[in-house]
């Protein structure tokens, strides 16, 4: 009986030690800040990979602010939360692309949708051509990087053709 009791105590002690080692190991995983992470990124492809792998569309935030423009999140906040909606993703992409390489000349683009539910994306230039980054939407048909385009009007046509519910954009312009 004493032998079984000793074995049970030893087993409990070992299990507790393993559990404590596991907890301390998890606590030691370094979490990089926005600044640290972006300083390691070299091209727009690094941002694309992060957006595709780590960023998610915030459905609850989208529903809460549907039809209005919510208070935009900072790039740091979007990075930390790893989620957002159209305006958050556009601001994050613009700030990040311009930090990676100012020659991208990233800008926020607004698509004016009849009925007032505007959509925001990020444009950037590469080799003199226009590209659009859009991760702030639940519609997979328009998520990602699109282009090259010769103009915003050309992207507008792409958007109208590929968006599953919006088939007419009233206007498209750069946000000032």
PLM region descriptions:
Residues 15-16, 30:
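Intrinsically disordered low-complexity regions specifically enriched for long asparagine
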Residues 17-24:
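Bacterial N-terminal signal peptides
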Residues 26-176:
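A structural boundary/capping signal
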């Amino acid at each position: 009986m004493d032998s079984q009791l000793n074995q049970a105590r030893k087993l409990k002690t070992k299990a507790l030690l393993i559990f404590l080692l596991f907890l301390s190991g998890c606590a030691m995983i370094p979490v990089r800040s926005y600044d640290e992470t972006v300083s390691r990124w070299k091209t727009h492809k690094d941002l694309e990979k992060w957006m595709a792998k780590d960023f998610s569309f915030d459905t609850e935030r989208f529903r809460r602010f549907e039809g209005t423009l919510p208070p935009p999140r900072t790039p740091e906040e979007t990075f930390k939360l790893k989620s957002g909606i159209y305006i958050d993703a556009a601001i994050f992409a613009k700030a990040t692309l311009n930090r990676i390489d100012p020659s991208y000349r990233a800008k926020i683009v607004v698509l004016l949708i009849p009925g007032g539910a505007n959509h925001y994306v990020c444009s950037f230039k590469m080799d003199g051509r226009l590209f659009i980054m859009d991760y702030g939407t639940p519609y997979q048909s328009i998520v990602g990087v699109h282009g090259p385009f010769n103009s915003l009007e050309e992207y507008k046509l792409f958007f109208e053709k590929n968006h599953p519910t919006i088939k007419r954009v009233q206007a498209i312009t750069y946000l000032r």
